[in-house]
Amino acid sequence: MRKLIFSLVTSFFLLLPSVIRADEGMWFLMFIKRLNERDMQKKGLQLTAEEIYSINNNSLKNAIVQFNGGCTASIISPDGLVITNHHCGYGAIAGLSTPEHNYLKDGYWAKDRSQELPPKSLYVRFFVRMDNVTDRMLSVVNSSMSEKERQDALNREMEKIQKENSEGGKYVVSVRPFFQGNEYYYFVYQDFKDVRFVGTPPENVGKFGGDTDNWEWPRHTGDFSVFRVYTDKDGNPAPYSPNNIPMKAKKYLNVTLKGVQENDFAMILGYPGRTNRWVSSHWVDQQVKYGYPAWVEASKTAMDAMKAHMDKDKAVRLKYASRYASLANYWKNRQGMIDALTAHKTADLKRAAEKKFAVWANKPENKAEYGNVLSDLATYFEKTNQEAANHNYLLLFFRASRIVPQANGYVKQLNTYLNSSSDQEKQQIRERIAKELDAYYSESYLPAEIDLFADNLKLYADKATDIPQEIAQIKSQYNGDFRKFAAEVFARSIFTTKENFENFMNNPSSDALQSDPIAQIARVMIDKYYNSQSEALKDGYEKAFRKYVKGMRDSKVSLILYPDANSTLRLTYGSVKSLPKDKRNHDVKRNYYTTFKTMLEKYKPGDAEFDMPKKFVEMYEKKDFGRYLDKDGTMHVCFLTNNDITGGNSGSPVMNGKGELIGLAFDGNIEAMAGDVIFDKKLQRTIVVDIRYVLWCIDTFGGAKHIVDEMTIIQ
């Protein structure tokens, strides 16, 4: 590997003080020696910054992976054993499950390597290195460019940087903007695509508490699943092959059974997906009043349609389990955001900061560049408030009815097919679409798909403003009966059944393709989604927001000292910490952990959310917990830290000061749901499943001691 030479450019990070406060912040590993090491060690870290992040030597970052693009996981054995959340592995596990072998419901533990199962599609991504390319990227743009011209120029430079650092395709290279395009860094990754399912607890352990307990504390969810990374015989990434071997890990985490006490040091490495802490007060107002309410309503509409079919048929429930869980998660999140942003008066706090910024912006030396920034932002949001609701009704229609956005892509491919003179190209297109549609058919249930399409299209037609003329005509023609319309459309479309598609391919024609009703709906709705705002309006906002962020930093008005999350590897550190007592968390003062006993208090035999294996009750009565008991004599299940996380951190390893695994992050608390916009030092918490409970579930309850034996256990 080439030695990385850091850019010695003047950057935000290099100008920061050498000590940063803990708790708040999603920090770049590249800068922790300069910015965080001293503070972390003062609070209990027993490692050096080099032991956390090193380019040329093995460090903790080599044991952390992005899991399937949306979660985090960690390597916990020399042979590539990977642990993440149950809800992160949910889709892969559901895809492997059948009514006869329902791994999702019943759980599963591979007895040996031959029983480790390959999901249809799963990968992990290792972080290799990063560097600052701000000067290079900004040298290709200027203030006279439109936003499209600017982005085109940036994209061209990104492609060059990616090519220069991919080493002929060995690595995946991503150039990412930070601080709203005021800084740029590139990231080098290596992907491994042979990842096999090793085991998971039963669903009534991995999802104990269900939607009711989601985002809540106290919590008792055994939210974990286990996989393994495989490589070719030389240790390189390779597609699935029975000849592949378990990865020989460069670095893996030791697992400790010592447990935690309140105020113990705790740090998390992971891939937080997205935060919006630099947004203006206008953004907060728009989301609370328009955007989030539409999301909540549209999510619930899709969930109700889905659940009606899931409740009638176990096979259908399996097909839709992962999609339903995703919808339910965001539904509760968005409602929690509305409540938290309102309760904490977040918009008012933003307005107070903007008043200070306005004073600075209107100073003679700043006015030319920053004088109009706040008014430009205000104008944009005034003009787009209703559009925020329209956008989310439309977005959730696409999420509910997957065939619509998929059909749009198929039409493009089939047009190429019809115009191609190459038999080889035509065969490749035909096989590719057939394979994708087969996956759709196997994961879908036609009556449910019809209702999802109909109900969310009706909601959009009834609630959105400025709907396309074609949708208004359908509403009028069918007197608002979108289920009748959907049934007719699905009967006629070439994409909705395998038989219809094969009939079309036996006699393909451009006329049939262009007149396909699903394809027509897709064209109309996707065009509306991407073209609802004028280029001038979008240009004005992007320029104003970029200047706003730059000005807030230059003026020192903002106390935020880190970039928003954007699915790049970050570190957060803090401590094990109780929540302030209230009725919501059982009015317990020292409530930083939960126990097996308090989990049994929630137990409801046969309940969809609070059932548990009968064996759990029997083992509790026998006190069959062995070495996994806490020194207080109880079995701890979950605990709290005040780390700063968001979506994408699911599955992240929570480590003590020695870098040993103490648990897995799997949720935040609803009291601090505004955390993506503003960090609440008093209430922000990370909910963690205790690694001792995880190991007990694998070893004692699951009978898979051989898996635990792979790990390095610290007694």
Swiss-Prot record:
The active site is at residues 87, 223, 650. Keywords: Aminopeptidase, Hydrolase, Protease, Serine protease, Signal. Residues 1-22 form the signal peptide. InterPro entries: Pep_S46 (IPR019500), Peptidase_S1_PA (IPR009003), Peptidase_S1_PA_chymotrypsin (IPR043504). One of its GO terms (biological process) is proteolysis. The record marks 668 as: Critical for substrate specificity of DPP7. It comes from the Bacteria. One of its GO terms (molecular function) is dipeptidyl-peptidase activity. Its EC number is 3.4.14.-. It holds the Pfam family Peptidase_S46. The keyword Transcription regulation does not apply. Belongs to the peptidase S46 family. Catalyzes the removal of dipeptides from the N-terminus of oligopeptides. Most potently cleaves the synthetic substrate Met-Leu-methylcoumaryl-7-amide (Met-Leu-MCA), followed by Lys-Ala-, Leu-Arg- > Leu-Asp-, Leu-Glu-, >Leu-Lys, and >Val-Arg-MCA, while this enzyme does not hydrolyze Gly-Arg-, Gly-Gly-, Lys-Lys-, or Gly-Pro-MCA. This is Dipeptidyl-peptidase 7. It comes from Capnocytophaga gingivalis. The gene is dpp7.
